[in-house]
Each structure stands twice: as structure tokens, then as C-alpha cells.
């Protein structure tokens, strides 16, 4: 009888985790219908509500990797985590804040590669002393990022050493954007299908884990609900930021490179940290680096293409300092992850580089 009562309680009553989840979701929905006269309070309010939603997203995607593998789980985590960046980028373009949209996406890459990954490696290293990962995953992902970096450098050189008008630059950016999207799709085919065996650290991870299908559906449902809420909240957030920029004459680029990435990238960074603490270092790397790949090879090209239909011109031309900071982020990540092992000190190095970059950016803009 006691065992039956325990089973009954497990099945019919909501646990503490479900209560917290429902509370966060309900608060988020209520805030969508609240509008305060102060733009600063609105921005703070929507920024704060994005954090618990991002944590929920991170926990959900971490659970998914148990059922579909760390590579696919990391891919889903990165995809879901990049939805806010895409939405905030589109809304920024709609409000005419082109420089903030571009700086926000570049800042998201820097935040993922240095801060998010640094905290994940640091926390994972403190708990497990040493964590091993698949070098092929890291090398392939970083090679794709270097392709984007070379593309941006070539476009910058073209702008510096040739006479090209804005219309031609837009056309060039559109063509290159399509090429990057195609390469990204080919990379997914390579890593998930044709050579998926190369991206598995442990043979046991090839076998699917037994789990309740209802639990899996609940997790997917949670991810969908949280993603939708993040879409609407990001709209309100960008609208508030636009009002603050116009009222206080704050630099769009500074907000884009610092504030927007911290909020938009919170989901994948939280997921990366959770995975590292659970010793799923492959999923952690796939989330952080895979998110940067999606931003540079999918989100940015999509924004370039969409901007043409929105009446704005968004190209792939970045400033010299932006290119330097992005190169430093990729270079540091490459040197840290080339040996197939991570330690807490390497995470501390990545965090230190992020602090140096952000402090430098304060004086540049």
C-alpha cells in the first residue's frame, strides 16, 4: 500500500521543479501585459525576466542530450539559445539600429567563446579536476569559425583597398551570406550523418538512453514555450533600449557589444555551464562554440537577407577593432581546446581575456 501511495504521489502531484517552472512562465506572461512609463525600468524588468527563462532553457536542453546524444543535444541547445539573438537582431533592424544589431551578434560570439565557455570550463574543472572532450568536434567547429573570420577580413580589405559603393557591398554580402548558410548546412550533414562516428567520444554515447517518452515531450514542450516567451520579451526589450538610446544618446555599439549579448546569450551560456557541471563537456563545447557558428554562419546571413526585404542595408562589413576582438576570441579558444582536455585555469584565462576586451571596448566607443 505504501509503495502504491508513493507512486500515486509521483504521478498525480506537481513537484517543486514543476512549480518553479510554472511560476516563472506565469510571471513572464503577466509582464508582457504590463507597461510602465519609465523606459529604464521596463528594460531592467524585461532583462531580469530573461534570466530565469534562459536557465529553464538551459536545463531543458541539458536533459535532451541524455536521450539524443551530446552532439545533437548541443545543437538543439545552441539553436534554441540563438532565437533571442535572431529576434533582437530583427527588431533592432526594424527600429533602425543597424550598428547595435551587428555589434550585438558580434558581441554574442565573443561572449560565448570567452565568457560563457570560460565559466563553463572553470566550473567543470573545479568539480572534476580534468575533463576530456572530442578534439575532432572542437577542431571542426573552430575551422568553420575561422572560415567566417577570413570572410570578414576579406570584405574589410575589399572596402579598404577598392572603390565599392554601398549597393554593391549589399549584393556581395547577400551572396556571401548564402554561401555561409550552405557551408553551415554541409557541416551539419557531415557531423550528424555522413561522419557522425567521428563526433562521439565514448562508444556508450552511441546507444540511446532509455527514458520516459512523456518526459521527453514535456522537455520539448518547455523549450517551445520558453522560446516563444523570449521572442515577445526580446521585442519589448529592444523597444525599451531604442527609447533609451534616443533619450540619453547612448552608443548603440556599446550596448550591442556588452548588454545585448549578455542577455541574448544567457540561454546557451547557462546550458553550457549546466552541461559542464554534469561532466557533459562535449555538449558544453557544442553549445558554446556551436552557438557562435550558428550566429556567424546562419543568424547574421539571415539578418542580411531579411534586411533587404525590410528596406535596410545590413552588410558583413565590421570595424577593425571588432575584427581584432573576434580574432582574439577565436585564437584563445583554439589554443585552449587543441589538446582534448580542459582545466579550470584555462577557463580563468578565457574569462580574463573577456574582461580585457570589454574594458577596451568601453574606451573605443
Segments (PLM) and residue ranges:
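Transmembrane helical segments that form the transport core of multi-pass membrane transport proteins
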Residues: 209-281
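Alpha-helical transmembrane bundles of multi-pass secondary active transporters
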Residues: 2-59, 114-239, 318, 324-365
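Residue-level signature of catalytic and energy-coupling elements of molecular machines
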Residues: 64, 110, 184, 245, ...
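Short amphipathic alpha-helical coupling elements at transmembrane boundaries
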Residues: 62-66, 70, 243-246
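Conserved, well-folded catalytic cores of nucleic-acid-processing
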Residues: 67, 86, 157-160, 269
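Helix-loop-helix junctions within the multi-pass membrane cores of secondary transporters/permeases
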Residues: 25, 73-125, 255-312, 328
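Hydrophobic, membrane-facing alpha-helical anchors
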Residues: 1-6, 52-66, 267-277, 300-307
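The feature identifies polytopic integral membrane transport proteins across all domains of life
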Residues: 68-78, 99-106, 130-142, 170-174, ...
